Regions:
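Low-complexity "stalk/linker" and mucin-like segments enriched in Ser/Thr/Pro/Ala/Gly
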Residues: 70-83, 154
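Conserved structural position at the C-terminal beta-strand
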Residues: 104-106
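Feature responds to low-complexity, polar/acidic, surface-exposed segments characteristic
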Residues: 23-35, 41-42, 118-139, 152-174, ...
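Short strand-edge motifs at loop-to-beta-strand transitions and within beta-strands
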Residues: 84-88
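Sec-dependent N-terminal signal peptides of Gram-positive bacterial secreted proteins and lipoproteins
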Residues: 3-24
Length: 311
């Protein structure tokens, strides 16, 4: 005996059957990759002093990343570039800790979890603040050099200025590196052994002689046979990298930062690679031959302090 199925029920059964068949045979949607993973960070600056940093995230597929702030800071102002470089400036009178949240976005639109950046606001030991460094990403680095007794800018009519874009001389940078390394200086140095010894200031000679004896520097030739130091010549980024690398005795790395591969001479490539691996190369450097500025030197040396503190 055939069972009678009402037309309406038969129609619904047919629709259900076709829907199930289509679901069973449909190809799964293509995935757009995994979400990036953002890193929690901690930085320190002085009360009222701007500090720069770089947001960090890793994408499993190696996609390019951009960054966006999800939770703003409550004790200061924040400027963030799409590539992750940021500047945080504490509000006057604020102390303790502050923080902000951010996410990383890949080219497929995948978003990371929210990561946090904790900022510690500490009290200075000195009263050195620079009137020409307000809101500058290198302000904290500049003040840190003064705090550590390595370099202090000029005091003009009761106000300190750092002159961040001023080129650093070879003798100035060498002296800062030797002070940072803690190497004992040779005493009562009257002659360094370089052909241009007469052009080297008396205050710099102990640094030059100590660095020469320890292999930190070797000088260069100016077209003649005798080696010269060139104390008052502006130091290049590549030269500074070699001196700092040797002064800190960094471990050689095989990693070469891609941005420098075609702009680094052979004699500087290892040192540039070593500093890049340790995060010591300053933001905005375009070539090894460029003159190193004061603010770039400050950034390099404060990162070097971090490396030494972690040893």
């Amino acid at each position: 005996m055939k069972r009678f199925i009402p037309p309406a029920v038969a129609f619904l059964m047919a629709v259900l059957y076709l829907s199930m068949a289509a679901y069973a045979t449909a190809e799964p949607e293509a995935t757009t990759g995994s979400a990036p993973v953002a890193e929690n960070l901690e930085i320190t600056t002085y009360r009222g002093v701007s500090v720069g940093g770089v947001l960090s995230a890793v994408d499993p597929e190696g996609d390019s990343l951009t960054f966006t702030v999800t939770t703003p800071p409550s004790k200061g102002t924040l400027e963030v570039e799409e590539d992750g470089h940021f500047v945080y400036t504490p509000d006057p009178g604020r102390r303790g800790k502050d923080y902000f949240g951010y996410k990383a976005l890949d080219s497929e639109g995948n978003s990371s979890q929210e990561a946090t950046v904790i900022i510690r606001l500490v009290k200075q030991k000195t009263k050195v603040t620079y009137s020409d460094m307000a809101g500058d990403c290198g302000a904290c680095a500049a003040v840190t050099l003064a705090e550590r007794g390595i370099f202090t800018g000029e005091n003009l009519a009761g106000s300190y200025v750092f002159s961040p874009d001023t080129p650093v001389t070879r003798s100035q940078f060498l002296a800062m590196c030797m002070e940072l390394s803690g190497a004992p200086l040779l005493q009562d140095v009257s002659a360094t052994g370089f052909a241009d010894d007469g052009e080297i200031d008396a205050w710099a000679k102990p640094y030059v002689s100590t660095a020469l004896k320890s292999g930190v520097i070797s000088g260069y030739t100016d077209g003649e046979t005798a080696a010269v130091f060139g104390a008052e010549r502006p130091i290049s980024v590549g030269e500074a990298a070699v001196i700092l690398d040797r002064a800190l005795d960094l471990t050689d790395t095989s990693v070469v930062w891609s941005a420098y591969e075609e702009a680094v001479p052979t004699w500087a490539s290892q040192s540039m690679s070593d500093l890049a691996a340790c995060g010591m190369l300053p933001h905005g450097v375009s070539a090894a031959s460029a003159s190193l500025t004061r603010v770039q030197a400050a950034e390099m040396l404060t990162e070097a302090m971090r490396v030494l503190d972690e040893r």
